[in-house]
Every structure is written in C-alpha cells, then in structure tokens.
C-alpha cells in the first residue's frame, strides 16, 4: 500500500494524461471532419461540372444520332452497286503484280511465294541485288493476312459487309466534319450577335444568370457540336460563358435543396428510425452544400466579379443564410418526432433517445447560429419531458 499522498499524485497524473488524450482525440476528430468536408466539396464541384457537361453531350448526341440515321439510310442504297462492281472487277482484271488481299485463296495453307524478279532485259544497266529482308517481311505479312478469313471471301476480295462498315464510318466522319463547316457558315452572323450579347451582359441577381444561361444553351442547341463550331470564332468569350454556366449550376443545386427542405413533411406512417434518417440525410446534404459554397466562395468570387456575375448569394446575407435558416425546420420536425415517441413510450425516456434529439437540436443551433421563437418553444417542450420524468 502506498501513502495517500502518492495515491493522490498518481491519480492526478492519470487524470492529466486522460485529459491530454481527450484533447488530442478531439483535435484529430476535428481534422478528420474538415478533411471529409473538403473531399465532399471537391466531389460536389466535380459532380456539378460533370452533370452540366453530360446534359450538353446528351443533347449533341441526340442530334448526331438523328443525322447519322438519315445518312446511313441514303448510303446503304448506294453501297450495293459499289460492292458488286468491285467483285466483278476482281474476277475480270488480274494484276500482274499480285497483292496479298487479291491473290489469296481459301484452300491455301501456305502463304503465296513472293513475286518473281523482273528479267534482266528490263533492268537495263542498273545493278540490283536480292534483299532477304524484303522476302521475310512479305511472307510475314501474307501469313498474317491468311488468318483474316472473316474479312476475306473466296475470291480474295473484302466482304461486302466489311466494305459497308468501312465506307459507312468514312461517310459518317465526313458528314460530321461537313456539318460542322456548314453550321459555321450558316450560323456565322447569329454567333457574332451572341458574342456581342455575352460580352455586354451584366446582371444584378443570380436568377438573371440562370435565365441568361438557359437562353444561351437554347440558342446553341441547334449546332451539331458546340465546341467544334465555336472554335472557328476566336472572339467567342468561352471563359465568361463557362463561368456563367458554373455560377448558374452552383446556385441551382442549393436553391433546389432549400425548396426541398421547406416543403418537407414528416410522414406519421414511417417508423421512428426511418423518419429520423430522412431528416438527418437532408441535414447532411444541407451542411455539405453550404460548406462547399463557403469554401468555393473565395476562389470563385473574384472571377465572378471580373465577369460581372453576382456572387453575393454565397454570403450569409444571401442564399446561404436562407439555407441555414431553413435547417430550423428540420430541427423542429426532429424534436417533434422525438417528443411524440417519448410521450407514447415511457420506457424510452431514460434511454439515448432524448440525448439523440438534444444532440441534433444542438447541431442545428450551431449551424444556423441560433433558434427562432418557434424552434425554441419546441425545444422547451422536449425539455419538459425530461424534467417531468426526473421529478416523477
């Protein structure tokens, strides 16, 4: 047994070590949370850009597909005579200098011999010598060609199906380039008008940017390939248009999320777990959206200012402040559901359910910067349940 003084000193030492570990643990958890938020912000930003790019690509793909379908229908009517003509030629005309794709026979198991050397009469006074590497390379090529039976028919001519595929691909590519050139010439004056309108565009509210971007996309939707056509216009303000689209997309997502939260209604038929998970999921999405916007604000704010794009909506006095305030509705629904469960099931009063409700309320309180009168009243009602149980 140690004296009481030594016991007290050991106890104090252990308490201090425990406190130090707790502080360190809190610090690590905070850093981990910040890293998760940063990763979520980057993923959201990438997702925003990908979604907008996919929308534009799908629109262009539909137009390309419709134009290709029309060209393939016309091309198929013209390709049959070509293939017949090529087959006929292959049977009537024989080239004295055989090629692997014309001289091959289906029954041959060995590659054909190399072409004979020309006679000395044709050589004149020039001196020549045999080159073994030419023979080896020729035999290697002919051996490889002999294994391509699926592409060569019995007469040694490429099959009509293979011909059609090759011709179809060439025609499609040629038509695509032709359509780009045609769009460049046809819409030249209209695109010059769009350039002047984009360069002169100024906005006082972010909702005006949404409308303007929608109009620009509609005006450019008739182009077979927007990027390919606009490359022919050096004065096209690409950076400003991209910034406008980015701002509209970054504003649209949190705005829609805020509307979803304001219209949220708890379904009494849902179980307690389902109801609380729905509310928690909305709050997680809300925090992620707000954090992403706040972190993006410093990097994009200056660029938006340069292009006269409204950026004040990213401040607490704008949309971000409205989103934080909308989280109070989630706190109200969460606490109401907890209180209802506690009142109907007394056994849960001393469990973790009350702590769960208070913890969520505290999280919203810190996120929104406080409670309004209605939310505070619901909190007091929840608090009374605990007080009543303690007195009982």
UniProtKB/Swiss-Prot annotation:
Q: Name one GO molecular function term.
A: microtubule binding
Subcellular localization is given as: Cytoplasm, Cytoskeleton
Fetch the InterPro entries from UniProt: CHUP1/IPGA1-like (IPR040265)
Q: Which residues form a coiled coil?
A: 11-52, 269-299
Which positions form S-S bridges?
none
- Recite the UniProt keywords alphabetically: Coiled coil, Cytoplasm, Cytoskeleton
Biased composition range(s): Polar residues:
65-76, 100-109
Q: Please give the residue ranges the record annotates as the region Disordered.
A: 65-128
Cellular compartments per GO CC = chloroplast envelope; cortical microtubule
User: Where is it mainly found?
Assistant: cytoplasm
Give the record's family classification.
Belongs to the IPGA1 family.
Role noted for this protein: Microtubule-associated protein probably involved in the regulation of microtubule organization.
Name the record gives this protein? INCREASED PETAL GROWTH ANISOTROPY 1-like protein 1
Please tell me the species this chain comes from. Arabidopsis thaliana
Which lineage is the organism of this entry classified under, starting from the top rank? Answer: Eukaryota, Viridiplantae, Streptophyta, Embryophyta, Tracheophyta
